Amino acid sequence: CIGYGEEEKNIKSLVKELNLEDQFLFLKDISQDAKNAFISKSNLFVMPSIIYKKSVEGFGIAFVEAAQYGIPSIGGIDGGASDAIEDGKSGKICDGNDLDEIYSNINELLTNNSYLEFGKYAKSYVKKFEWKNIIEQYKLIL
């Protein structure tokens, strides 16, 4: 887990309760290079955004960053995840408030290595967010 927030203590307690300490590493502030290294070695990127105190994840650049490495994402329906994830192809969109749905999506992608197929698609899908392609889209509009 990279980051911190009000739920950090609860998440750490849950990891301990489930005896998963050897499978989690909690990091707070890390460099961009370190973050990219962790993402590139992952099988799946999970950030089930929710509306919290009238605030929500905007575009979801983190999903694009993961896709650049061929890592599929699971994002919450609230916020900008659906702008960066093609549901059912480059990742999954779920209700970030529904733990069963989040688990089900994680399980689905990790079962039978489905994440590999999703990751390949994510790596090609993310090219639409490259500046040269965005500029071409603006030219069409103008």
Predicted feature locations:
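A short, well-ordered alpha-helix in the C-terminal region of glycosyltransferases
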Residues: 23, 101, 108, 114-128, ...
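Short alpha-helical donor nucleotide-sugar binding micro-motif in glycosyltransferases
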Residues: 29-30, 37-42, 138
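Short hydrophobic beta-strand element within catalytic cores of glycosyltransferases
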Residues: 63, 68, 72-75, 85
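Conserved acidic donor-binding segment of nucleotide-sugar-dependent glycosyltransferases
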Residues: 86-88, 92-99, 108-113
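Nucleotide-sugar-dependent
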Residues: 50-64, 82-83
